[in-house]
Amino acid sequence: MRKNRAIRTIAGVLAATLLTGCGAGESENMNQESKVSSDTLYVQKVENLPEDFIMGMDASCVPALEKGGVKYFDFDGTEKDVYEILSQNGINYIRVRIWNDPYDANGNGYGGGNCDIDNAVEIGKRATQYGMKLLVNFHYSDFWADPGKQMTPKAWKNMGIEEKCEALYQYTKESLQKLKDAGVDVGMVQIGNETNGAMCGEKSSDLGGWARITQLMNAGSKAVREICPDALIAIHFANPENADSYASYGKNLDYYQVDYDVFASSYYPYWHGTLENLSQVLSKIAETYGKKVMVD
């Protein structure tokens, strides 16, 4: 892949081995003493990484984990802010997902970290404090958005496409303004999550579906350009093992003139094919459309 077209990333998931979930409501037994075994894990270092390599990690659940009693320690056994530990060990980007309203009518969180904008601001401030940039991942849903489900947020449920685009634009703009006002260093904004032919309740299988999906994407991009003009804009898909699908996504983004900088892809090796295929698929996108590509 062309050197000047690739954003080089390693995506990680921050996990706590003493937890079965990351919702604050799942932490009833956190104060009970647990037996933990210790062992050595060795990962061979990748040599000669370029200076612009993005070493990223999704840390969206950290506040919920900490509320459940989780603490973090460095290699010397000293308790520290986990974001300081990450920064000291080469992480330079923190990815945080944002759900519109991850709570039921009684104010109970859906779980998964209850990742609303306030959670993102808290994470962003701490990441920025330790010299890391934030990748803001808007799902435009009240809970997980993925290829199997792209549900419209409750507040937007009965909106037509024009009204929904305006709501998405305003929500994106207001959320980014909150991050900006808090002094967060936003380096990239992801418009949607794993938007494989669907986003925010719109489906490509419906007549005019891609036109509506890309209209929503452009509404989000407009807000980013206005509030965070220096941030990169990413559009995100999954299942790179389906090369024809990725080619189709690229064509639709180009045809409908979506304003974006980075074509981003999930990559789970168990499901998503070989690294060779991933490289070929993303290289084709970069070469065809002149976009940066990224795995996150």
Regions found by a protein language model. Name each.
Residues 20-21:
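C-terminal motif of bacterial Sec signal peptides marking the signal peptidase cleavage site
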Residues 52-56, 92-95, 133-135, 185-190, ...:
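Structural preference for beta-strand elements that scaffold enzyme active sites
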Residues 1-10:
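Bacterial N-terminal signal peptides that target proteins for export
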Residues 109-110, 115-121, 145-251, 258-260, ...:
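Active-site cleft segment of glycoside hydrolase catalytic domains centered on the general acid/base Glu
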Residues 200-201, 235, 265-268, 288-296:
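Active-site clefts of carbohydrate-active enzymes
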Residues 60-62, 99-101, 139-143, 191-196, ...:
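Active-site beta-loop-alpha junctions enriched in small/polar residues
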Residues 46-51, 81-90, 122-130, 178-184, ...:
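Acidic (Asp/Glu)-rich catalytic clusters
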Residues 33-122, 126-128, 133, 141-167, ...:
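N-terminal substrate-binding region of glycoside hydrolase catalytic domains
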